[in-house]
């Protein structure tokens, strides 16, 4: 990872090749993507590890096994403690992308990963409440208002799909509670202070990120 992140001065982070602890021929995470539905998802999850053998650019490094450049991390303002437990890696990677830095995947760095080792299960109140809260905060923090407006139909659809999913799982109220808390975080004085201010200097990066989020939705998520 150290060698990979040192290859270019604009590489902010490098994500390891995370294979399943239960089956080391299967990918658990090969870098993270983010799409216009407001969903973060693991690249390659559940697929054969042999198919992920080349370095490439990713939306953000998975914080479960990654390296970050300290100088850039200090420039960005470190990890946001308000993003506790979920999506903090997407947040810091997104902030880096806005400034023109890159996040990479390095297949030579292999980690055996036990998914949901911290929260204890794939679906539980702790995870659903925090991840839904943070998903709203992530958008409010990193998207300028016009980008939120443009993506609103996609975001509404994404949140509605997840809400219906969690209703069926018996966690609808928990998911809705998390969304409300995320909105309150965005509207709080602390949330407003942490919001990334739009700058025309970074307009090309915003356009590139928007295109990537749409591509991740329609090509990598819906029709993959």
Description of each model-found segment:
Residues 13-15, 22, 42, 105-107, ...:
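Hydrophobic residues in well-ordered beta-strands that form the structural core
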